[in-house]
Amino acid sequence: MRSSPWISILFVVSAGLAAQTAAAGPQEDVAAEGQKWGTVFADNNPETMTALYAKDGVLWGTLSPTVRSDPGAVKAYFVAAFQALPKATVKFGDQLIRVYGDTAVNTGYYTFSYTKDGETKSIPARYSFTYVKDGNDWKIVDHHSSAMPAPAAAPAPAPAATAAPAAAPAPAPAR
């Protein structure tokens, strides 16, 4: 019995897709958690945001100088954030993801965008998320976010070198 070349092609393609699916690993899972955080943030729901954090998760948020170290405080932060930045969205930039067994760190930058008084505004910020594996989920145990600082000013030029004063002439020898 002769098999169709289409069956062979289909087999090769499906095997390749299965290999790609199997290749997804912890780094991709952590990247997906970052995207999930951004999607949930855009929903402006403090309860859902808080659920992404571990019970002992810590948040140093962009909009507050206060560290939040329990679920009630994390939720209060997002209640205030969603009032301050109505209908805010976040777009992730470059991410550096490192996975150490059941712990992962995602460091990078993101930009918050929102509209207030008819004007679209943005806040570029840098972040670090630390995750711990909890069953099949990654939970945030530490999240630091701070507004991106303004670029440093160029250093002032060094003062121009001045010539040293001429040495006084040596006294004439006595005669």
Where would I find each of the regions flagged by the language model?
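Short beta-strand edge/turn micro-motifs at domain boundaries
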Residues: 124-149
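Hydrophobic/aromatic beta-strand elements that line small-molecule binding cavities or substrate pockets
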Residues: 78, 92-97, 110-112, 126-132
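Bacterial N-terminal signal peptides
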Residues: 7-18
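A solvent-exposed, acidic/Ser-Thr-rich amphipathic alpha-helical stretch
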Residues: 27-33, 46-100, 121-122, 149
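Short, low-complexity N-terminal intrinsically disordered segments enriched in polar/charged residues
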Residues: 18-55, 72, 151-175
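A short, structured loop/turn motif at beta-sheet edges
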Residues: 97-104, 119, 131-137
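A short hydrophobic beta-strand element
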Residues: 102-112
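Positively charged n-region of N-terminal signal peptides that target proteins for export
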Residues: 1-5
